C-alpha cells in the first residue's frame, strides 16, 4: 500500500518561476506548504522533516531545495511527479492531459495509486477548502508558466525581452494546441491589446469596467492566489480571529507567517548574519539595516529636503516630518500627506455626483460607479463573507465595511462606543475587563497596550531615543520631547478659565486648577497630611521611611531630594553659575545669591515677633528666638 507523502502535496518552483511571484504570493506559498506539512504530521503520514519545510521555516528561497535534490540524483521524486499526484488527490479536472504533458508533468498515471485514498481522506479532512483551492491555483500557474517557456513559444524570443513581456504573447501562440481552450486566455488578452497594457499592468484605471474584468481573468492565472490571500486576511482582520497559537507561550496570531516569526524568539535562531560586524538577526529586514549601519550606506534620499537616510521606513517618516503634503482637496484646498487621508476627507463632503440607474446608488467617484456596474452585472470575483458585497478587482472589504455603516463599524457592547478599526475596539475593551496582557519582565508592571510597555522598558534600559534639536536634551517618550520643545518656543497653549494664567504643559494647568478648588486628594497614611499632587506625597513619605534614593557617584553621599544632590555635585565640579551683578561674587546655588543680594539692598525679611529685630536669613532668626525661650 502506497501512503500519501509530503512530496504528493508539495509544489516546487524553479528560480525563474519563483521570481515571477511577488512577496505576498511567496508568503502565501510558505503558509500553505507549512500547513500541509503540519496536517500530514498530525495524522502520522510523515515523520522526517523535508528539506523544503526546513528551508521555508528559515525563510530561504525554496528553489534552492529543488536544485539540490536534483543534484543528489533523485529525478523520480522531482516536481513533475509531485504535481501530477497532487492534482489527482485534489480531484482536479481543470488541466487536461495534453496540458500536463506540455508542461512536462509525467511519471504518474492519471488514476490514483492503490492505497492512496485512505491517507488522502485523512489529509483533506484537515485542510480548509481555501487551502486546497490555493494549491490548485499554484499548479495552474506552474503549468502555464511551463507552456510559456517551452521551445515553440520562446524560439523567436528577443534577447532584451524578459519573462514578463514574453509570457502573454508566447502562450497565446500555441496554447490552443495544448488543450487549454477552457482557460479563455486568448479572449482575455485581446482585451488587453485594446488598452495597450502588455507591459504596464498598473494602468488598469484607464480601461473600461469590462476590460477590468478580463484583465482580472488573465491575472487569475498569474496572481489569482493573491486575491484569495487578501480576502482571507481581510476576513480574519475584520473578525479579530487569531487561529495560529504558539505552543510555548500561548500567544495567538492572525497569520501563520507571524507565528513562524514569533517562534524564532523561543528557539533563539538567527539565520541572517552581517559580514561586517558578525551580528545575527531573525528577520531579513533586521539584517539589512545593520549592514547599512556598518557600511555607512544611506541608499534612500528624500526628494523634499535632500536628506539621505539608511532605511526606507525612516525615509517615510522624514517625508511626514518635512511637511510633505502632496495631496490637495480641490473643493476646500486642504492638503494631506497621504492619498488615503484625502480620500477619507472627500467622503466627508457627502457629495456623490455619480448615480447608477439600475439600483439608484450614488457614488463619490466615477470609478466607484464603474465598480457598481460590474457588481450588478454579476461579475463578483471576490466576496466578503461578512458583508456579502462583491469586489471585482483589488477588493477592499475593510473600506467597504467602514463606508457601509457610517465609517465606524466596530461597536463596544458595554458602553456603545464606536470605532473605525477593530484594533481600537480591542484596546478599548480592556478598560472594561481590566486586562493588562503586556507585562514587564524586570519589575512585573503590566499595561493594556504594547506601546506603553515599550515606553516603560526604557526606564530600565535608560534608553532615550528622542532628542531635542535645539539643546540636545534627550527624552524617553515622544510626548515628553513635544512638551520640552515649548520651552524654546515659549508656546503656552493651556489657559486657566478661572484666572487666565497660561501654561506650557497640560499637567501644569491641572495642578494649577487645584489652587482654585482647594482640592488635596493625596493623603499621607502616616501623619494625615494632604497634598495636591501625587509626586509631592511620594517625596513626603521619605520623611517617614528615611529613604534616600539619590547617591553621589563621587563621594558616595546619599540624599533624600533630587535638588539636594544637584546642589551637592557642584561642590565636586567647583561650578558657580550664579553671579552677583553688584560685586561679581559667584555662588553654587541661586538661594545663596538671593541671600547675598540682601547685603547690598539692606533687606531683612525675617522679623522677631518678641522684640521686633529683623534678620537677612531665616537661620539667624531661629538662633535669635532661642534667646527669648
Swiss-Prot record:
GO MF terms held by the record: DNA-binding transcription factor activity, RNA polymerase II-specific; RNA polymerase II cis-regulatory region sequence-specific DNA binding; zinc ion binding
Q: Name one GO cellular component term.
A: nucleus
Q: Keywords in UniProt for this one?
A: Acetylation, DNA-binding, Isopeptide bond, Metal-binding, Nucleus, Repeat, Transcription, Transcription regulation, Ubl conjugation, Zinc, Zinc-finger
Output the Gene3D superfamilies linked to this UniProt entry: 6.10.140.140, Classic Zinc Finger
> Which organs or tissues contain this protein?
Expressed in adult heart, brain, placenta, skeletal muscle and pancreas, and in fetal lung, kidney and brain. There is little expression in adult lung, liver and kidney.
Instruction: Tell me where it mainly resides.
Output: nucleus
Matching InterPro entries, A to Z? Answer: KRAB (IPR001909), KRAB_dom_sf (IPR036051), Znf_C2H2_sf (IPR036236), Znf_C2H2_type (IPR013087)
Question: What is the protein name for this chain?
Answer: Zinc finger protein 195
Q: Which organism is it from?
A: Homo sapiens (Human)
Taxonomic classification: Eukaryota, Metazoa, Chordata, Craniata, Vertebrata
Amino acid at each position: 500500500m502506497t501512503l500519501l507523502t509530503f512530496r504528493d502535496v508539495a509544489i516546487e518552483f524553479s528560480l525563474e518561476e519563483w521570481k515571477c511571484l511577488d512577496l505576498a504570493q511567496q508568503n502565501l506559498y510558505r503558509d500553505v506548504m507549512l500547513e500541509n506539512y503540519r496536517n500530514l504530521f498530525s495524522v502520522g503520514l510523515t515523520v522526517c522533516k523535508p528539506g523544503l519545510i526546513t528551508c521555508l521555516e528559515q525563510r530561504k528561497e525554496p528553489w534552492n531545495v529543488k536544485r539540490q535534490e536534483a543534484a543528489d540524483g533523485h529525478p523520480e521524486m522531482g516536481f513533475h511527479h509531485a504535481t501530477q499526484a497532487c492534482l489527482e488527490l485534489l480531484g482536479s479536472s481543470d488541466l487536461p492531459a495534453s496540458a500536463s504533458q506540455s508542461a512536462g508533468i509525467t511519471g504518474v498515471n492519471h488514476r490514483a495509486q492503490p492505497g492512496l485514498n485512505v491517507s488522502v481522506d485523512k489529509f483533506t479532512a484537515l485542510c480548509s477548502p481555501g487551502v486546497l483551492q490555493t494549491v490548485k491555483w499554484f499548479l495552474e500557474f506552474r503549468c502555464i508558466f511551463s507552456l510559456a517557456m517551452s521551445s515553440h513559444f520562446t524560439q523567436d524570443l528577443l534577447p532584451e525581452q524578459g519573462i514578463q513581456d514574453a509570457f502573454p504573447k508566447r502562450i497565446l501562440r500555441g496554447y490552443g494546441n495544448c488543450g487549454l481552450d477552457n482557460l479563455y486566455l486568448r479572449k482575455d488578452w485581446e482585451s488587453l491589446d485594446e488598452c495597450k497594457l502588455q507591459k504596464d499592468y498598473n494602468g488598469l484605471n484607464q480601461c473600461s469596467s469590462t476590460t477590468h474584468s478580463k484583465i482580472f481573468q488573465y491575472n487569475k492565472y498569474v496572481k489569482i492566489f493573491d486575491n484569495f490571500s487578501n480576502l482571507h486576511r481581510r476576513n480574519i482582520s475584520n473578525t479579530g480571529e487569531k487561529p495560529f497559537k504558539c505552543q510555548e507561550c500561548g500567544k495567538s496570531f492572525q497569520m501563520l507567517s507571524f507565528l513562524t516569526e514569533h517562534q524564532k524568539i523561543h528557539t533563539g535562531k538567527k539565520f541572517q548574519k552581517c559580514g561586517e560586524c558578525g551580528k545575527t538577526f531573525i528577520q531579513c529586514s533586521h539584517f539589512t539595516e545593520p549592514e547599512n549601519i556598518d557600511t555607512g550606506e544611506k541608499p534612500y534620499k528624500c526628494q523634499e529636503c535632500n536628506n539621505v537616510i539608511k532605511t526606507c521606513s525612516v525615509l517615510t517618516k522624514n517625508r511626514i516630518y518635512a511637511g510633505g503634503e502632496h495631496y490637495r482637496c480641490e473643493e476646500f484646498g486642504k492638503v494631506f500627506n497621504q492619498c488615503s487621508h484625502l480620500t477619507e476627507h472627500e467622503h466627508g463632503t457627502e457629495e456623490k455626483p455619480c448615480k447608477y440607474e439600475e439600483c439608484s446608488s450614488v457614488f463619490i467617484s466615477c470609478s466607484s460607479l464603474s465598480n457598481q456596474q460590474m457588481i450588478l452585472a454579476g461579475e463578483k470575483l471576490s466576496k466578503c463573507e461578512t458583508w456579502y458585497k462583491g469586489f471585482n478587482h483589488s477588493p477592499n472589504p475593510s473600506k467597504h465595511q467602514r463606508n457601509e455603516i457610517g465609517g465606524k463599524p466596530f461597536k463596544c457592547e458595554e458602553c456603545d462606543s464606536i470605532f473605525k478599526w477593530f484594533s481600537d475596539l480591542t484596546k478599548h475593551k480592556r478598560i472594561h475587563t481590566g486586562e493588562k496582557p503586556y507585562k514587564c519582565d524586570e519589575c512585573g508592571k503590566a499595561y493594556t497596550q504594547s506601546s506603553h510597555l515599550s515606553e516603560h522598558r526604557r526606564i530600565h534600559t535608560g534608553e532615550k531615543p528622542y532628542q531635542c534639536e535645539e539643546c540636545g536634551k534627550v527624552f524617553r517618550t515622544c510626548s515628553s520631547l513635544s512638551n520640552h520643545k515649548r520651552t524654546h518656543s515659549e508656546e503656552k497653549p493651556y489657559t486657566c478659565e478661572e484666572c487666565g494664567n497660561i501654561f506650557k504643559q497640560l499637567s501644569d494647568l491641572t495642578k494649577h486648577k487645584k489652587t482654585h478648588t482647594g482640592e488635596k486628594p493625596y493623603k499621607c497614611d502616616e501623619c494625615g497630611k494632604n497634598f495636591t499632587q501625587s509626586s509631592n506625597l511620594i517625596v513626603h513619605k521619605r520623611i517617614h521611611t528615611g529613604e534616600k534614593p539619590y547617591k553621589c557617584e563621587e563621594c558616595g553621599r546619599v540624599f533624600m531630594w533630587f535638588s539636594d544632590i544637584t546642589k551637592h555635585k557642584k561642590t565636586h565640579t567647583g561650578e558657580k553659575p550664579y553671579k552677583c551683578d553688584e560685586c561679581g561674587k559667584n555662588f553654587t546655588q541661586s538661594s545663596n545669591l538671593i541671600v547675598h543680594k540682601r547685603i547690598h539692598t539692606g533687606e531683612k525679611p525675617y522679623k522677631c515677633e518678641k522684640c521686633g529685630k529683623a534678620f537677612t536669613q531665616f537661620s539667624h532668626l531661629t538662633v535669635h528666638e532661642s534667646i527669648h525661650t
